[in-house]
Amino acid sequence: CLYSADGGVPGDFHFQHYAARAMGGAGLVFTEMTCVAEDARITPGCAGLWTDAQEAAWARLVDFTHRHTQAKLCLQLGHAGRKGATKLMWDGIDQPLEAGAWPILSASAVPYFPHSQVPRAMTRADMDRIRDDFVAATRRAERCGFDMLELHCAHGYLLASFLSPLTNIRDDEYGGRIENRLRYPLEVFAAMRAAWPAAKPMSVRISATDWKDGGLTDGDCLAIARAFAAAGVDLVDVSTGQTVQDAEPVYGRMFQVPWSDMIRNEAGVATMCVGNITTADQVNTILGAGRADLVALARPHLANPSFTLHAAAQYGVRDIACPPQYLWGKDALLRNASREQADLRELRLKARPRSHAPSADALVSPNVG
């Protein structure tokens, strides 16, 4: 998330951010989690889609992207739940607001930190209202012209709070076994799917594990993926964790890929993997091994909006889309890429330490006739 909206309206920073990545060669650009109501925000700076002004701003971005690039745009919709009413990321991530907070909701009255605001456990009336908020935002997304829609059910936010047994301690039909914990998230998804054009894809983002004893199991993860697939999801965006503040994740390169692999190959559902994937070689290794259908890279694109174009140049791929205004730069990049790779190979050879192993002649025994 950019945490840079004013009144939920995406502004100039959002426009240049998403447009730059689209012009830089990315095939599919996901938005940040876009909130479906004012009280659905994580922070006061979160972007939303519940007003006409917000809709107009998003529509401008979509129109520009479609006119000037070949990229597709996916809008990610979500509700912060118990992780709402918090400070901007750079002021203290997940820390509660000291002033100006709004009431928050969750599956159960379980705060994120001991000092966080205690959320109110949702009633059936709350569920109806928030489901309708998601549907209203879905209809706005279609009017904006987005190509794809994603429902955020991960990272401990509202819908994720129903899925995890660490945050869902309800004793009604929405708590207990995984089938009950899935009930409300599936209800929201089904309502959105009915409002979203059948020809346009929908994905769902999930946390495949909570990285905490007593949390989601692999069996739960597969059940969640299968249930959403049966409800009409086209893709599962596989993330992990961020459910509870005392989780114990094990980080590393491509560390979330095993769950994408499991869902794709055991549940038979198309997946997108994310998380500490930083190079084009890693992407192609994942795809070539059949461990995901799509790979999302966020931080590499934060550092380099034209990451995809640079990756294509490294592979010698010339037919990657580029706005005509930037063709001279693309040509220079492709022309220089092979030279730079040759220079790097030469440098590595020169930097290789000299061998101290005996030569082949020295290993031949002398003729002592």
Residue ranges and their predicted role:
Residues C1-G369:
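Flavin-dependent oxidoreductase catalytic cores
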